[in-house]
């Protein structure tokens, strides 16, 4: 039996008998605003595990990049290749292989979520996003908008490419290769999602550098937790119907929790506890994770 090495917001990482292999165990927990909600979503972990595995296999089949997936060994578990994690900024050796890149890469295709809120505050400009100054929520960007955030700080923070290079100590060519992979992966996701009437709005991804420092896609992506999705038919009618964890965020924005939490963090106070979800929202969320697995993969859940 292995031992638990790490307890994340939505999954556990366990050791195995092979020192180079780890086991991901996905839980039914759900988190928003870097807080774990004290409500469980039935079969959510299974949905995340199976959805990510679907994307990993497609990406390998199309030769986009390597991945760390070894095999799916249970409905809510998978085996992955271990990568070394070095949290100290700038400390990763330039010749190290199978090492985690301590950054998150966000790719946006439509104006929504936190990008919309930053756009309204003037923190993101029309020129940066490739949209008109008077554009509305949900506007399609003229080209994908890439952002980099920190990984090992208390809260994720948007950073420049220059700071990303300092924190990770990877080369500019390696960062550009990561960006290139993100765009290719998102093109694949967009193509597959469109088959079942879905729009891929945005998403985040994490990487390692594997053999010969080649880019390796790791962790989870292309799910309702890391990515945002809309219904394509509704979008054509001018409506952005959230088919992702965003509607859970919207619930807490509506209750005022998000504003209270932001105020506490801005003043350096302790986070206020996040309340449980109403049963109706739990049921709707469980149904969403099940139905979206089927729409994303064209497989039965």
Regions found by a protein language model. Name each.
Residues 170-201:
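A long amphipathic alpha-helix within ATP-dependent nucleotide-binding catalytic cores
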Residues 2-149, 268-301:
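Active-site loop/lid in soluble adenylation, ligation, and acyl-transfer enzymes
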Residues 121-177, 214, 221-301:
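Anionic ligand-binding catalytic core segments
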Residues 70-71, 193-210:
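A short glycine-rich, hydrophobically flanked beta-strand micro-motif that places a catalytic Asp/Glu
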Residues 116, 212-217:
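Short acidic, Gly/Pro-enriched loop/turn segments at secondary-structure junctions
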Residues 28, 109-111, 207-211, 221-222:
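Short, flexible loop/turn elements at secondary-structure junctions
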């Amino acid at each position: 039996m292995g031992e638990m090495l790490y307890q994340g917001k939505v999954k556990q990482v366990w050791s195995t008998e092979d020192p180079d292999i780890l086991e991901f165990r996905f839980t039914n927990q759900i988190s928003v605003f870097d807080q774990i909600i004290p409500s469980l979503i039935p079969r959510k972990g299974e949905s995340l595990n199976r959805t990510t595995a679907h994307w990993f296999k497609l990406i390998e089949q199309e030769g986009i990049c390597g991945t760390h997936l070894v095999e799916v060994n249970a409905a809510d578990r998978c085996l992955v290749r271990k990568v070394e994690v070095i949290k100290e900024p700038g400390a990763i050796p330039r010749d190290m292989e199978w090492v985690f890149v301590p950054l998150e890469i966000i790719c946006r295709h439509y104006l929504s979520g936190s990008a919309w809120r930053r756009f309204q505050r003037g923190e993101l400009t029309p020129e940066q996003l490739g949209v008109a100054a008077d554009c509305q929520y949900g506007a399609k960007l003229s080209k994908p908008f890439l952002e980099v955030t920190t990984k090992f700080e208390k809260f994720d923070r948007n950073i420049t490419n220059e700071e990303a290079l300092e924190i990770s100590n990877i080369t500019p060519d390696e960062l550009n290769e990561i960006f290139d992979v993100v765009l290719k992966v998102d093109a694949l996701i967009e193509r597959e999602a469109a088959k079942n009437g879905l729009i891929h709005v945005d998403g985040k991804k994490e990487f390692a550098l594997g053999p010969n420092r080649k880019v390796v896609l790791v962790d989870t992506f292309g799910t309702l937790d890391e990515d945002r999705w809309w219904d394509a038919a509704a979008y054509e009618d001018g409506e952005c119907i959230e088919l992702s964890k965003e509607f859970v965020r919207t619930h807490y924005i509506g209750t005022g929790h998000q504003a209270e939490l932001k105020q506490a963090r801005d003043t350096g106070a302790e986070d206020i506890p996040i309340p449980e979800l109403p049963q109706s929202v739990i049921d709707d969320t469980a149904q969403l994770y099940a139905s979206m697995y089927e729409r994303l993969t064209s497989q039965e859940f």
